[in-house]
Amino acid sequence: MMSSKPIYKRVLLKASGEALMGDQGFGIDVAVADRIASDIAEARAMGVEVGVVVGGGNIFRGVAVASKGGDRVTGDHMGMLATVINALALATSLRKLSIDTVVLSAIAMPEICESFSQRAALHHLAQGRVVIFAGGTGNPFFTTDSAAALRAAEMGAEAIFKGTQVDGIYSADPKKDPTATRFDELTHSEVLGKGLAVMDIAAVALARENHIPIIVFSIHEKGGFAQILTGGGRKTIVHDK
């Protein structure tokens, strides 16, 4: 049942790099970044504390290097840098809306942004700032989905909001299979057991271990984030039962 007030006080939003790309084939669509920032600003206006993890696939994917015979570790480091670019872009969009925002990077680059620590993240959240986590986990072989689950646990998030291209988790790709059905809710174990493409195995397992729900929704629906924060909207909830 939908309420006029948010049912979460502190959340982690995971946005893929592809989401920032919009209809372009590469890079950042500023209009899309501005719209996502507007949705985050709406959540802040409701009093919700928001942390954000952004991917880097719109600029570079580390696995692309490995698939062509290159060094995976170097490729992943390049992908981490791509997430910093995206984090800075989203922070710029938020600041245009007068939303106090800080970027915390898992890779030290003090001339560009602050370095991540749990203490810093909790301090900034308590001060009402949006905290954007960049650089993934800071380690190769871990996806930004895993970074999202890790940061959610560290910041004490009540839920992970996974913004995707569709409005929830489906039995198959709804863009390819018209008979695909959307799940209203699942358990973490069901997601892992069915091999559903939500987040990678490590991310879902970490969320399960820390009893953090994962809410999958369409990041392209303007105002959808705030609507789901109040219990409405189309989504799939992954939680313990």
Curated annotation (Swiss-Prot):
ATP binds at K14, A15, S16, G17, G57, R61, T164, Q165, Y170, D173. Its EC number is 2.7.4.22. It holds the Pfam family AA_kinase. One of its GO terms (molecular function) is ATP binding. Pathway: Pyrimidine metabolism; CTP biosynthesis via de novo pathway; UDP from UMP (UMPK route): step 1/1. It catalyses: UMP + ATP = UDP + ADP. It is found in: Cytoplasm. InterPro entries: AceGlu_kinase-like_sf (IPR036393), Asp/Glu/Uridylate_kinase (IPR001048), Uridylate_kinase (IPR011817), Uridylate_kinase_bac (IPR015963). Catalyzes the reversible phosphorylation of UMP to UDP. This is Uridylate kinase. It comes from Agrobacterium fabrum (strain C58 / ATCC 33970). The lineage of its organism: Bacteria, Pseudomonadati, Pseudomonadota, Alphaproteobacteria, Hyphomicrobiales. The gene is pyrH.
